[in-house]
Amino acid sequence: MASELAMNNSDLPTSPLAMEYVNDFDLMKFEVKKEPVETDRIISQCGRLIAGGSLSSTPMSTPCSSVPPSPSFSAPSPGSGSEQKAHLEDYYWMTGYPQQLNPEALGFSPEDAVEALISNSHQLQGGFDGYARGAQQLAAAAGAGAGASLGGSGEEMGPAAAVVSAVIAAAAAQSGAAPHYHHHHHHAAGHHHHPTAGAPGAAGGASASASGAGGAGGGGPASAGGGGGGGGGGGTAGAGGALHPHHAAGGLHFDDRFSDEQLVTMSVRELNRQLRGVSKEEVIRLKQKRRTLKNRGYAQSCRFKRVQQRHVLESEKNQLLQQVDHLKQEISRLVRERDAYKEKYEKLVSNGFRENGSSSDNPSSPEFFM
């Protein structure tokens, strides 16, 4: 068993242990173990693996150069095949993989995975530069002993990482450009490879270049096609991430597209024609704003009309009051004239009785006419 574990990378496809591991690995029920991985635990496990000495060149002996192992993993003792198999089944080396593989994308059969592994039997050189730099930083933190477990070359990628890249290539080739998966992959790659990048498009481009490099380094047809598909998906995710702020900025700028006066004076048909292609929430918000403005304008118009009508009524009231005063003055003048004429008449009547005496047959006397 120790001789089988000490095989080189060229014997990986024909190894019974590797084939048994691939057959036992249920790709249809892929799960990622969600456990926090501490640096000191990784360093101690790397040191323990180096002290064993028998796993320095096997696919499962590169947790530091490829991916941190499960906390339940330990160096197997030679001669215990069942314990080694149990450790291999419990070895979740996908928890720290930089691209955060989505289990929904692994919708292929085990035969396709075996073909992908066979086509990617050779080591990938220079495909994942950012991944190699991360391995070098981890090896520098672990010390000289952990650096020796990396094989003396930080740019050389471990066989476990080659297996992971083959699985990702086959998944991308069969599942196509899944929007949710590539979007998630884009964010994860941007987080691991470019922690200081602020633009989503830059992170998407980096993930696309990393996927494309992985596919080109494999040399196999499945690897090249899968890598190209992954790269295209990463670029699409980057473009989508770049378009999201554009849509948001367009929505913010769309609010200033119509002024308040235009919203109020514009007809409903014209407004609907202008709002074609706009999101439903934006249309509802603009129509609510238009309704609010129209109600506000209607209230202001009613208030203005009431004030104007009050002014008109007050002016008419003043005119009527002036006319009443004028009529009162006219009445008082007529009353004075009437009193004067009455008094004058009484005087004439009294003077006529004195002049004529008691002669009643005089036609000029007032009694004759009365």
Curated annotation (Swiss-Prot):
Residues 126-370 are annotated as: Represses ARE-mediated transcription. The gene is Maf. GO terms for cellular component: cytoplasm; nucleoplasm; nucleus; RNA polymerase II transcription regulator complex. Disruption phenotype: Knockout mice lacking this gene exhibit small eyes or microphthalmia with an absence of normal lens structures, an abnormal chondrocyte development, with terminal differentiation of hypertrophic chondrocytes initially delayed, followed by a subsequent expansion of the hypertrophic chondrocyte domain in the growth plates of embryonic and postnatal long bones. They also show a lack of IL4 production. The keyword Nucleotidyltransferase does not apply. InterPro entries: bZIP, bZIP_Maf, bZIP_sf, Maf_TF_N, TF_DNA-bd_sf, Transcription_factor_Maf_fam. Residues 285-310 are annotated as: Basic motif. It comes from Mus musculus. Residues 313-334 are annotated as: Leucine-zipper. Residues 285-348 form the bZIP domain. Residues 57-84, 175-244 are annotated as: Disordered. Ubiquitinated, leading to its degradation by the proteasome. Ubiquitination is triggered by glucocorticoids. Phosphorylated by GSK3 and MAPK13 on serine and threonine residues. The phosphorylation status can serve to either stimulate or inhibit transcription. SMART domains: BRLZ (SM00338). It holds the Pfam family bZIP_Maf. Acts as a transcriptional activator or repressor. When overexpressed, represses anti-oxidant response element (ARE)-mediated transcription. Involved either as an oncogene or as a tumor suppressor, depending on the cell context. Binds to the ARE sites of detoxifying enzyme gene promoters. Involved in embryonic lens fiber cell development. Recruits the transcriptional coactivators CREBBP and/or EP300 to crystallin promoters leading to up-regulation of crystallin gene during lens fiber cell differentiation. Activates the expression of IL4 in T helper 2 (Th2) cells. The keyword Transcription applies. Residues 180-195 have a biased composition (Basic residues). It comes from the Eukaryota. Residues 72-82, 196-211 have a biased composition (Low complexity). Changing residue 15 to A: Inhibition on transcriptional activation on CD13 proximal promoter in endothelial cells. Gene3D superfamilies: 1.20.5.170. Expressed in tubules of the renal cortex and hepatocytes. Expressed in the lens (at protein level). Expressed in pancreatic islets and endothelial cells. This is Transcription factor Maf. One of its GO terms (biological process) is lens development in camera-type eye.
